[in-house]
């Protein structure tokens, strides 16, 4: 089964870093996406806020460059996580992160 997602946007919630009891580093943040997409010949506004988690040592270095307002592209897979309130939420598990040059 295929499960791949590429999403570009702006980091809208500060990264939160934790280390699991087994020593695996995790970085969590929220990515906000806004764009205009074409569907059935019409333009529509697309918007979402997607929680992102970066796990393992491989991608942790780039997470130290990520702050609120950073523009990035994230590639990975999606999965549901059960929140503390018991509700499920979709989470993007990042496997590749690219900083988008702001052109400044």
Swiss-Prot record:
Superkingdom of origin organism: Bacteria
Family to which the UniProt record says this protein belongs: Belongs to the PriB family.
Biological processes, Gene Ontology terms: DNA replication, synthesis of primer
Biological role: Involved in the restart of stalled replication forks, which reloads the replicative helicase on sites other than the origin of replication; the PriA-PriB pathway is the major replication restart pathway. During primosome assembly it facilitates complex formation between PriA and DnaT on DNA; stabilizes PriA on DNA. Stimulates the DNA unwinding activity of PriA helicase.
Record has DNA-binding as a keyword: yes
PROSITE patterns to which the protein is assigned, alphabetical: SSB
NCBIfam families: PriB_gamma
Protein name: Replication restart protein PriB
Gene3D superfamilies from the UniProt entry: Nucleic acid-binding proteins
GO molecular function term, any single one: single-stranded DNA binding
SUPFAM superfamilies given in the database record: Nucleic acid-binding proteins
Keywords: DNA replication, DNA-binding, Primosome
HAMAP family recorded: PriB
Subunit field text: Homodimer. Interacts with PriA and DnaT. Component of the replication restart primosome. Primosome assembly occurs via a 'hand-off' mechanism. PriA binds to replication forks, subsequently PriB then DnaT bind; DnaT then displaces ssDNA to generate the helicase loading substrate.
One Gene Ontology CC term in the entry: primosome complex
Occurrences of domain SSB (ranges): 1-101
Organism (species): Salmonella typhi
């Amino acid at each position: 089964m295929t499960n791949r997602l590429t999403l570009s946007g702006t980091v809208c919630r500060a990264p939160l870093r934790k280390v699991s009891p087994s020593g695996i580093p995790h970085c969590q943040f929220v990515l906000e996406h806004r764009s205009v997409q074409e569907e059935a010949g019409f333009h529509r506004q697309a918007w979402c806020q997607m929680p992102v988690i970066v796990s393992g040592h491989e991608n942790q270095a780039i997470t130290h460059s990520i702050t609120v307002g950073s523009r990035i592209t994230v590639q990975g897979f999606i999965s549901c996580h059960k929140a503390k309130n018991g509700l499920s939420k979709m989470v993007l598990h990042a496997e590749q992160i690219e900083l988008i040059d702001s052109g400044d």
